[in-house]
Amino acid sequence: MKLPGKIAIMGGGSWATAIAKMCLAQEESINWYMRRDDRIADFKRLGHNPAYLTGVKFDMKRINFSSNINDVVKESDTLIFVTPSPYLKAHLKKLKTRIRDKFIITAIKGIVPDDNLIVSEYFNKEYGVPPENIAVLAGPCHAEEVALERLSYLTIACPDKDKARVFARRLGSSFIKTSVSDDVIGIEYSSVLKNVYAIAAGICSGLKYGDNFQAVLISNAIQEMNRFLNTVHPINRNVDESVYLGDLLVTGYSNFSRNRTFGTMIGKGYSVKSAQIEMEMIAEGYYGTKCIKEINKHHHVNTVSYTHLTL
C-alpha cells in the first residue's frame, strides 16, 4: 500500500519542527502551514525556525511554506497536525477545504477543550474523516532530542495497520525507529494522561519531595492509566510498551518535558499564569486535567494521583 502524495506539517512549534526534520529525511519536499507570515519570512531568511529548535537547519528549496490553511490542504494528501490542542479549533476556523478524503495524522498530545474529545474523535465528528483515515503519532520522543539526532522510538497508530506501516516507513530514519498499533483511542488518552502525571511529578520536584516519592508517584500513575484506558476503551493492550509507559517515564523525568517544568514551577510557588508566561510554551497537561476530570465523571475510574491535581 502507498499513501498518496505530499505531506503537510500543520503547526510551527518545536514538535512540528522536529517532525518536519524527520519527514525530510525521507521526503523530497513537504508543505508547511504556519499561521504567521512574519514567522515564515524569518524562517526563509534564517534557514531555521526562528523561535524553536533554532539549531536545526533546513533546505528552503524543499519546503513550501504558506499561512493560508486552505492552500496547504488543497496541495497535500497527508496532513500532520501539530497544533496545541487548546488552539486547534481556532486554527481550523478558516478551513473551508474538504479534508474527509485526506489522511490525517495527529501528533497533538491533548484533548480539544469544551468538546472534551480526543483529536481523532474531533476530526471524525466535526469533519467526517473516517477512522481508517486518521492516525496518531506518539511515543517517548522529545523534539529537542530529535534535533540532536539522538536515537528515538515512535509509534504510529491507525485502525488500518497497513496505512500505519506505510507512514512508519516514510518517517523512519537512522535515528528514528518506528512501530505500529491499532490502539488509537488508548494511545491518545495515554498521551494526555502522561502530561497530567508529569505536572504532578514536577510539583513534587519543586516541593523537594525527592526521588523516592516520585518513583512511587509514577508507579501509581501507570496503574491508574491502565485502569482508565481499560474502562474508556477496553481492549487487549500492554501498557508496559514504550508508547504508554515509556512516554510516561520520559515526560515525568526529563528536563526537556515542558509539563514537568510547568509542574516544578508550580511546586516552587509560581501561579499558573506566571508559570505559563515564563515558559512561553504550552503545557498541554494543564488543559488536559480539566478535560479528563469531565470525561471521568461518566466512567468513575479510581485515579487518586490524578484527582489531587484537579482539586
Where in this protein do the model-derived segments appear?
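Short, conserved active-site loop motifs that form the nucleotide-linked donor/cofactor pocket
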Residues: 62-64, 176
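Rossmann-like NAD(P)(H) cofactor-binding subdomain of soluble oxidoreductases
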Residues: 66-74, 78-151, 167-169
